[in-house]
Each structure stands twice: as C-alpha cells, then as structure tokens.
Amino acid sequence: MEKNNEVIQTHPLVGWDISTVDSYDALMLRLHYQTPNKSEQEGTEVGQTLWLTTDVARQFISILEAGIAKIESGDFQVNEYRRH
C-alpha cells in the first residue's frame, strides 16, 4: 500500500477521442493530456486506447457526475486538494 504523504504526479486533461464499436456494444476512449514543463503544442500527449463496455461507461459517467456535484456543493475538505 502507498504512503499517504506520497506525491501523485498529475497532468491536466486537454481533450479526448471517443468512438463507438457497435458490433461489441462498447466505446473506445483516448485521453489527451498536458505534460508539465513543456509548451502547449510540444507537451500534449495521447494516452492508451481504452475499451469501455456500456455498463462501465455508465459507471464512469456516474462517478464523474458525483465528483462534479461534490465540488460544486463545496462539500469537500481543503486538505483533499493540497496533496496534489
């Protein structure tokens, strides 16, 4: 298990590619993110292609919506964001 004081490196999300794979009832997703210490044009990376079933995609959407609602409500601890 990781230590609580360990720093997690994060990268700002700047875009994505999403397409459907109708024959498998699935979606393919690639995230584009900014690499630190590089210019915007040089530093944009494209992550691996992810395969999401419709059930997993719905769960992902639900988790994102819950996170957005929590942030917008102001119902969070200040220390949650200082670690990043």
From Swiss-Prot:
Disruption phenotype: Cells show increased biofilm formation when glucose is present in the medium. In a continuous-flow system with M9C medium supplemented with glucose, the biofilm had a 240-fold greater biomass, a 2800 fold-greater average thickness and a 16-fold increased surface coverage than the wild-type. It comes from the Bacteria. GO terms for biological process: regulation of single-species biofilm formation; single-species submerged biofilm formation. Induction: After 3 hrs of cold shock. Pfam families: BssS. Represses biofilm formation in M9C glu and LB glu media but not in M9C and LB media. Seems to act as a global regulator of several genes involved in catabolite repression and stress response and regulation of the uptake and export of signaling pathways. Could be involved the regulation of indole as well as uptake and export of AI-2 through a cAMP-dependent pathway. This is Biofilm regulator BssS.
